[in-house]
Curated annotation (Swiss-Prot):
A biological process from GO: translation
Family: Belongs to the bacterial ribosomal protein bL21 family.
Originating organism: Borrelia garinii subsp. bavariensis (strain ATCC BAA-2496 / DSM 23469 / PBi) (Borreliella bavariensis)
SUPFAM superfamilies on file: L21p-like (SSF141091)
Disulfide pairings: none
Function (record text): This protein binds to 23S rRNA in the presence of protein L20.
Record lineage: Bacteria, Pseudomonadati, Spirochaetota, Spirochaetia, Spirochaetales
Gene that specifies this protein: rplU
Assembly and binders: Part of the 50S ribosomal subunit. Contacts protein L20.
Protein name per UniProt: Large ribosomal subunit protein bL21
Length: 103
């Protein structure tokens, strides 16, 4: 059983009992998470599609931890001007465990 859920403007595939890597969430929301913006639910081949969301559906999750992703390096070089710029960035993600999908 899996569901497509919209979290902070992005869509994720949520499977019961598995971890979900989402963009970092605020510390206020970190105890027990419930998302009601479910776009699609697939249970044993039976598919329910929302318009835009599936009515009376909910995904319950548990917050686990925040981690940083690999560093992404941006490099800019301007020829013949003795000018270069190198910038690194590490995106922070939150890992949540999908406890159950209710519909």
């Amino acid at each position: 059983m899996y569901a497509l859920v919209e979290i902070n403007g992005k869509q994720y595939k949520a499977i019961e009992g598995e971890f979900l890597k989402i963009d970092k969430i605020s510390p206020i929301e970190k105890d027990k998470l419930e998302f009601n913006s479910v776009l699609l639910i697939n249970k044993d081949g039976e598919i329910k599609i929302g318009k835009p969301y599936v009515a009376n559906s909910l995904i319950r999750c548990t917050y686990k931890e925040d981690k940083k992703d690999k560093k992404v390096v941006s490099y800019r070089y301007r020829r013949r001007k003795s000018s270069e710029r190198k910038v690194g960035h590490r995106q922070t993600y939150s890992y949540i465990l999908v406890d159950e999908i209710v519909f």
